[in-house]
């Protein structure tokens, strides 16, 4: 059973304590009403994993846990099998005592692009919206964050996060809650808020930007990473039924348009930190994610286009500040 009591106790003593007015009731309702048909199977996989305390833990350069002496073949097989019960693994990679989870996305590459542009994370309280398996939460801790909180309603991601946490010595510096941003009150409590790979899934992107702003302290930093297209500040793509085979893609602005949106929502010091084309080396099918991936979503005769004829995915990182 995945519990959230440790998180409640943690925030009861800090500047997030006002979240306890709504959060426990929301989590209780989620536990009663909204569990996925496979959730019991996934949570059992987490429960059956051994509790491990790393002899060496690297969260600065990767998410790697090692034991002082190599695990036995039986121990490795047990961990490997239980982690494979949580497939597909999309965000990573993780290296856990000799079990290497080669995820669909090289999320470490994204982190390497983002990190140089951030304010120092040392001592910061961070929110990661749409955090997936929580890979970047661990990297935030590795970069010095005091507390990293992720929210993502996808229940498989919660189980993946808890599995990794159990193998990292039950580390309580990072937490994942099965919520969407719309379920959060205006906490105004986070020093840095990340939204990576979320904006294009929102029917109202400006509302999403306001929701992110409501989570930041004054002078707090927003890190926004999303799909963009080429163009000026008035260029926005509104795809038809699908974009790169994804149904729920609503608005893909140019980076200059996105900068303008952020300024319209009252952010200051907005800058475009990075723009890059997503490659089939960064997002691909692996033995830990065996279904279709980016290569299947691009026009086989013209890799600069999706199968629907739109510009192929490129992603921008924008940094902004709440006044």
Curated annotation (Swiss-Prot):
InterPro entries: CmoB, Mo5U34_MeTrfas-like, SAM-dependent_MTases_sf. Keywords: Transferase, tRNA processing. Its EC number is 2.5.1.-. It comes from the Bacteria. The keyword Transferase applies. Carboxy-S-adenosyl-L-methionine binds at residues 91, 105, 110, 130, 152-154, 181-182, 196, 200, 315. GO terms for molecular function: methyltransferase activity; transferase activity, transferring alkyl or aryl (other than methyl) groups. It is an enzyme of class 2 (transferase). Gene3D superfamilies: Vaccinia Virus protein VP39. Belongs to the class I-like SAM-binding methyltransferase superfamily. CmoB family. Homotetramer. Catalyzes carboxymethyl transfer from carboxy-S-adenosyl-L-methionine (Cx-SAM) to 5-hydroxyuridine (ho5U) to form 5-carboxymethoxyuridine (cmo5U) at position 34 in tRNAs. HAMAP family: tRNA_carboxymethyltr_CmoB. This is tRNA U34 carboxymethyltransferase. The lineage of its organism: Bacteria, Pseudomonadati, Pseudomonadota, Gammaproteobacteria, Enterobacterales.
């Amino acid at each position: 059973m995945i519990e959230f009591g440790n998180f409640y106790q943690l925030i009861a003593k800090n500047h997030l304590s006002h979240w306890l007015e709504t959060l426990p009731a929301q989590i209780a309702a989620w536990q009663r009403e909204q569990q996925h048909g496979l959730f019991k199977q996934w949570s059992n996989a987490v429960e059956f994993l051994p509790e491990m305390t790393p002899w060496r833990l690297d969260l600065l350069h990767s998410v790697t846990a090692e034991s002082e002496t190599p695990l036995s073949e039986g121990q490795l097989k047990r961990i490997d099998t239980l982690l494979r019960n949580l497939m597909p693994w999309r965000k990573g990679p993780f290296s856990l005592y000799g079990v290497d989870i080669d995820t669909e996305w090289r999320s470490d590459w994204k982190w390497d692009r983002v990190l140089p542009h951030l304010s120092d994370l040392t001592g910061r309280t961070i929110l990661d919206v749409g955090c997936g398996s929580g890979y970047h939460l661990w990297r935030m801790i590795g970069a010095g964050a005091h507390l990293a909180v992720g929210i993502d309603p996808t229940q498989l991601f919660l189980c993946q996060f808890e599995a990794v946490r159990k193998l990292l010595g039950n580390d309580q510096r990072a937490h994942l809650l099965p919520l969407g941003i719309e379920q959060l009150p205006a906490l105004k409590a986070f020093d840095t808020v990340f939204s990576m790979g979320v904006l294009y899934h929102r029917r109202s992107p400006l509302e999403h930007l306001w929701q992110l702003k409501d989570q930041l302290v004054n002078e707090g930093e927003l890190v926004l990473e999303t799909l963009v297209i080429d163009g000026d500040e008035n260029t926005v793509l509104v795809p038809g039924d699908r974009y790169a085979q994804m149904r729920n893609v609503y608005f893909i602005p140019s980076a200059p348009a996105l900068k303008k949106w952020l300024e319209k929502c009252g952010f200051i010091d907005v800058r475009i930190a990075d723009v890059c084309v997503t490659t089939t080396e960064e997002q691909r099918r692996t033995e830990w994610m065996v279904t279709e991936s980016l290569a299947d979503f691009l026009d086989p005769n013209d890799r600069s286009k999706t199968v629907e004829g739109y510009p192929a995915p490129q992603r921008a990182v924008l940094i902004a500040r709440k006044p």
